[in-house]
From Swiss-Prot:
Residue positions, PTM Phosphoserine: 65, 75, 91-92, 153
Acidic residues bias: start-end ranges: 92-104, 159-182
Region (Disordered): 50-191
Record-level GO BP terms: DNA synthesis involved in DNA repair; DNA-templated DNA replication; innate immune response; regulation of DNA-templated DNA replication initiation
Modified residues (Phosphothreonine): 85, 116
EC code(s) of this entry: 3.6.1.-
Compositionally biased region (Polar residues): 76-89
Modified residues (N6-acetyllysine): 628
Protein name: ATPase WRNIP1
Keyword Iron-sulfur: no
Natural source organism: Rattus norvegicus
Quaternary organization: Forms homooligomers, possibly octamers. Directly interacts with POLD1, POLD2 and POLD4. Interacts with the N-terminal domain of WRN. Interacts (via UBZ4-type zinc finger) with monoubiquitin and polyubiquitin. Interacts with TRIM14 and PPP6C; these interactions positively regulate the RIGI signaling pathway.
Source species taxonomy: Eukaryota, Metazoa, Chordata, Craniata, Vertebrata
Subcellular location: Nucleus; Cytoplasm
């Protein structure tokens, strides 16, 4: 590496004096070290009166800084040999001087030297290394007028970040470098908005390059990255946590009771707990999160023990959040009971299952159940648009016909990403109120389109490719594969749908019956379960009005067992339509229920079986009177007058009366 002296460096020859950071006096650079030793003895740090000195126009006046804040500056010979190429710090400085705020952009240097007479020379107290790295050459282009008017300024160690931004194609203010006079793939964002049909009804930020969007989407799921931290950013659930609701008032005053958050997936249960956690940290409240899918009883006991210590020694509250609390069995849930009762912990549980069935009744009585509903389409659109804007993606108005492939750019340049407004609406509808599904579907669609363009450039070997990546409605549908159907074979929706199917057939609505059948099968329901329910329906609701209905149901069950899904769909559909059209009769069903009611309401021992109805297989039984007086009906041509009920129930008709 060649070391240059000040006489060989044209950049250092332009500077002569530097400013003392303590007393603000100007002096030759060679004397600054000895001057600082004397100045610090005469003027303690922070008490020196600054001397008046010139500052560059538009630059903020900077106060004195301690000597330790002085930073050495390196001069790179590769940059000095190209006076037309500005540094990243100079580019950002120039933009700050021309901005509306009158030079609010600060320089990246620790402090800037004042202007010196032309031809003056600065003698540094350390050698300046000349860099010969090829990566530092040709980092940017500068207009000739700007190169002639501006003079080079010292480079500090802080300019490394600016240099990296310049290499990545980012200018001083952090935005993408759109100086496309020498870039064949350059495009103007404003011109693209006008010609490419950017939706005017929705706010959109400045478009970011595709590679930057890709980096933003990598790592955690988009749904986790977009999780809000405050109630003000919480979208939806106005009935539960809207303005002037009791729960919102309690959360804002940090008086949090024990809660059970019940709602479908993606409705905001975990997000609401995340907001409570952030608010708790501000008030020095412990917030512990456990998942019932992997936590054990010992983990819960450890948290409770630590909560007891925190409460005893530091008077500090503990909030315990249990995600998927329904995965705990009843004995595990009993662990919380005494500690919730005495206030050792504040329990917040989240569940997608009906807490009436899945949560211990004693624990449920000590918690307030908050029902979170499925997010409406309007809320889903708002959530998706917030994510789209944060990613720097433009929304296009699909009513204006455009051809996104009509513009091409160099494969080495980064395109911008656009999405159709109807694609956003479709994603909001297909998500079915699940914000997690919608955001992750958006992430998948964007990454898939960016990857397809990258593979196109790599495999085709072509120089140019579309300069705009457009996400269409088909891309969104392909990412979700199908309509997002909320259905859980082991959850409440399982019972809701089979109940709806049963009632639709009972009401002779063949259209609704087919709908609920298809919804269950498309949601992944076991066809044999549906067939078993149809066998039950044949006797319960049709009964003797059409005795062949039971044969239809049994045949449908056997057919489903033989051929399976998806071929058995039509078998079940035929059976469902047959039952919806068949006459209904609950005579047998009601009579049997009357018999059960009679047995359950009987007081005392049940009456014995009459002797003439008992079987007498042995001689002893015959001697005891078993079967004595029984009349064998086939031996009589006329009806036989004989009682078949116990003596206490003579005259009871279960087909006409409910109780015996």
């Amino acid at each position: 590496m060649e070391v240059s002296g000040p006489e060989d460096d044209p950049f250092l020859s332009q500077l002569h004096q530097v400013q003392c950071p303590v007393c603000q006096q100007m002096m030759p650079a060679a004397h600054i070290n000895s001057h600082l030793d004397r100045c610090l003895l005469l003027h303690p740090a922070g008490h020196a009166e600054p001397a008046a000195g010139p500052h560059r126009a538009g630059e903020r006046a900077k106060g004195p800084s301690p000597p330790g804040a002085k930073r050495r500056r390196l001069s790179e010979s590769s940059a000095l040999k190209q006076p037309a190429t500005p540094t990243a710090a100079e580019s950002s400085e120039g933009e700050g001087e021309e901005g509306d705020d009158g030079g609010e952009t600060e320089s990246r240097e620790s402090y800037d030297a004042p202007p010196t007479p032309s031809g003056a020379r600065l003698i540094p107290d350390f050698p300046v290394a000349r860099s010969s790295s090829p990566a530092r050459k040709g980092l940017g282009k500068r207009p000739a007028a700007a190169a002639a008017a501006g003079s080079a300024s010292p480079r500090s160690w802080d300019e490394t970040e600016a240099q990296e931004e310049e290499e990545a194609g980012v200018d001083g203010d952090g935005d993408a470098d759109v100086d496309g006079e020498d870039d064949p793939g350059h495009w103007d964002a404003d011109a693209a908005d006008a010609s490419f049909g950017v939706s005017a009804g929705r706010a959109h930020p400045r478009a970011l390059p595709a590679e930057e969007i890709r980096q933003m989407l990598e790592g955690k799921p988009l749904a986790d990255k977009m999780r809000p931290d405050t109630l003000q950013d919480y979208i939806g659930q106005s009935r539960a946590v809207g303005q002037e609701t009791l729960l919102r008032s309690l959360l804002e005053t940090n008086e949090i009771p024990s809660l059970i958050l019940w709602g479908p997936p993606g409705c905001g249960k975990t997000t609401l707990a995340h907001i409570i956690a952030n608010n708790s940290k501000k008030h020095s409240i412990r917030f512990v999160t456990l998942s019932a899918t992997n936590a054990k009883t010992n983990d819960v006991r450890d948290v409770i023990k630590q909560a007891q210590n925190e409460k005893s020694f530091f008077k500090r509250k503990t909030i315990l959040f249990i995600d998927e609390i329904h995965r705990f069995n009843k004995s595990q849930q009993d662990t919380f009971l005494p500690h919730v009762e005495c206030g050792t912990i504040t329990l917040i549980g989240a569940t997608t299952e009906n807490p009436s069935f899945q949560v211990n009744t004693a624990l449920l009585s000590r918690c307030r159940v908050i029902v979170l509903e499925k997010l409406p389409v309007e809320a889903m659109v708002t959530i998706l648009m917030r994510a789209i804007n944060s990613l720097g993606i433009h929304v296009l108005d699909s009513s204006r016909p455009t051809d996104p492939l009509s513009h091409s750019s160099n494969c080495s340049s980064e395109p911008s990403v656009f999405i159709e407004d109807k694609a956003v609406d479709t994603l909001a509808y297909l998500s079915d109120g699940d914000a997690r599904t919608g955001l992750n579907g958006l992430q998948l669609a964007v990454l898939a389109r960016l990857s397809s363009r990258k593979m196109f450039c790599k495999k085709s070997g072509q120089t140019y490719s579309p300069s705009r990546v457009l996400i269409t409605e088909n891309d969104v549908k392909e990412g979700l594969q199908r309509s997002h159907i909320l259905y859980d074979r082991a959850g409440e929706e399982h019972y809701n749908c089979i109940s709806a199917l049963h009632k639709a057939m009972r009401g002779s609505d063949q259209n609704a019956s087919l709908y609920w059948l298809a919804r269950m099968l498309e949601g992944g329901e076991d066809p044999l379960y549906v067939a078993r329910r149809l066998v039950r329906f044949a006797s319960e609701d049709i009964g003797l009005a059409d005795p062949s209905a039971l044969a239809q149901a049994v045949a449908a069950y056997q057919g489903c067992h033989f051929i399976g899904m998806p071929e058995c769909e039509v078998l079940l559909a035929q059976c469902v339509v047959y039952f919806a059209r068949a006459p209904k009769s609950i005579e047998v069903y009601s009579a049997y229920n009357n018999v059960k009611a009679c047995l359950r309401s009987h007081q005392g021992p049940l009456p014995p079986v009459p002797l003439h109805l008992r079987n007498a297989p042995t001689r002893l039984m015959k001697d005891l009177g078993y079967g004595k007086g029984y009349k064998y009906n086939p031996m009589y041509s006329e009806p036989v007058d004989q009682d078949y009920l116990p003596e206490e129930l003579r005259g009871v008709d279960f087909f006409k009366q409910r109780r015996c």
